[in-house]
């Protein structure tokens, strides 16, 4: 149970305690304890944040830090609170568009701000912004549709579910987003 829920093996002491317990409900008690642990949310949030391409920095050579920890913490809290998946989705894709959104619902839209961001000298701001939109489209497609959309960026393919035209319709939806970070030359 420990490996499945928290992604780490139980300690020797925990194994000994489990084996020494005579109650038939011991397994259920252990699972309930693990599910109520903050580490449960951390473990499953890590899986989600990998899909959302979360990072604490921009990468590239400049590798500037990002203030995206609030989004990471929101995902952990959502996992620990067992937020229903439909609400989890709505708040990340459009939390700021809900009627009277709470600060947490606005933070959830940090999903859109985890795209690649190159702020090195010489990078054209509009090219950077468009690359962020492409990344947002591709990540949203992979995360919620379970489909890689990158091929449709260049061409339609008879085996892919998304045509090039549909890809750019999706792109148009996200293409009203301002540049995340200005270039610092």
Where in this protein do the model-derived segments appear?
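Short, structured secondary-structure elements
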Residues: 1-2, 6-185
């Amino acid at each position: 149970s420990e490996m499945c829920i928290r992604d780490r093996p139980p300690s020797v002491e925990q194994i000994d305690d489990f084996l020494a317990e005579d109650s038939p409900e011991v397994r259920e008690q252990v699972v309930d304890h693990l599910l109520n642990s903050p580490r449960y949310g951390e473990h499953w949030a890590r899986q989600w944040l990998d899909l959302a391409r979360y990072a604490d920095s921009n990468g590239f050579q400049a590798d500037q830090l990002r203030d995206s920890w609030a989004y990471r913490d929101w995902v952990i809290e959502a996992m620990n609170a067992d937020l229903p998946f439909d609400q989890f989705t709505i708040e990340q894709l459009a939390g700021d568009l809900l009627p009277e959104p709470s600060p947490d619902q606005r933070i959830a839209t940090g999903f859109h701000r985890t795209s690649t961001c190159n702020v090195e000298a010489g990078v054209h701001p509009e090219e950077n912004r468009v690359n962020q939109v492409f990344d947002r489209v591709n990540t949203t497609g992979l995360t919620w549709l379970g489909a890689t959309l990158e091929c449709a960026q260049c061409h339609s393919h008879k085996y892919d579910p998304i045509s090039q035209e549909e890809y750019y319709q999706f792109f148009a939806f996200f293409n009203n987003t301002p540049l995340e970070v200005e270039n610092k030359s």
